[in-house]
Amino acid sequence: MMMDANEIISFIQNSKKKTPVKVYIKGDIADIDFGPSAKTFITGQTGVVFGEWADIEAALEANKHKIEDYVVENDRRNSAIPLLDLKHIKARIEPGAIIRDQVQIGDNAVIMMGAVINIGAVVGEGTMIDMNAVLGGRATVGKNCHVGAGAVLAGVIEPPSAKPVIVEDDVMIGANAVILEGVTVGKGAVVAAGAIVTEDVPPYTVVAGVPARVIKQIDEKTKAKVEIKQELRQL
């Protein structure tokens, strides 16, 4: 079930903000206490330490006379939302996708390189999120859809009363299309590449343009052009 905006706001507000680091270190380090958050992998005079920067920074300063050299890797600061644990997701998720915690991903979905999926978003079974597409907070995509490369589904977390983007089943969204807040894209619809969708899209229609307008009903020719290939979704 999709999180509502107030649940997401509470989750972010109450989460412990984290600045995790990875430290490569050399010196007389075997007996150094790097703090309660740290995990250490030390052999002899060298090792790697994982943990919170506040703890590790204090240990580095207190033991600088023992340390010959170190390098710190850090990719976030006071982060409120961890990334989703992907190990048991029954979907194909390619390297470089960024998926935050509290995202729902259906079985046999495909998340391509560079896709970004924010907290509270839902990806239905068999849906493909293509390269560099963005699903904002609470955006919901149904089953057997294709969200094209570079497309944006606007997120809605604040104001909490705002309606999220909803994409129903069997929808094809073209590359670089933008679906604005509160829009529902009806079942079986097609959104042309580059379209900016500001109003609801009726089921089984094709919309195109800026702003997007209905240009025709789905016909057999259109169905052939936007066919979803299940072979790409097999695990």
Curated annotation (Swiss-Prot):
Keywords: Acyltransferase, Amino-acid biosynthesis, Diaminopimelate biosynthesis, Lysine biosynthesis, Repeat, Transferase. Pathway: Amino-acid biosynthesis; L-lysine biosynthesis via DAP pathway; LL-2,6-diaminopimelate from (S)-tetrahydrodipicolinate (acetylase route): step 1/3. It holds the Pfam family Hexapep. Belongs to the transferase hexapeptide repeat family. DapH subfamily. The keyword Transit peptide does not apply. GO terms for biological process: diaminopimelate biosynthetic process; lysine biosynthetic process via diaminopimelate. It comes from Anoxybacillus flavithermus (strain DSM 21510 / WK1). The keyword Acyltransferase applies. Its EC number is 2.3.1.89. This is 2,3,4,5-tetrahydropyridine-2,6-dicarboxylate N-acetyltransferase. It catalyses: (S)-2,3,4,5-tetrahydrodipicolinate + acetyl-CoA + H2O = L-2-acetamido-6-oxoheptanedioate + CoA. InterPro entries: DapH, DapH_N, Hexapep, Hexapep_transf_CS, Trans_hexapeptide_repeat, Trimer_LpxA-like_sf. Catalyzes the transfer of an acetyl group from acetyl-CoA to tetrahydrodipicolinate. It comes from the Bacteria. It is an enzyme of class 2 (transferase). One of its GO terms (molecular function) is tetrahydrodipicolinate N-acetyltransferase activity.
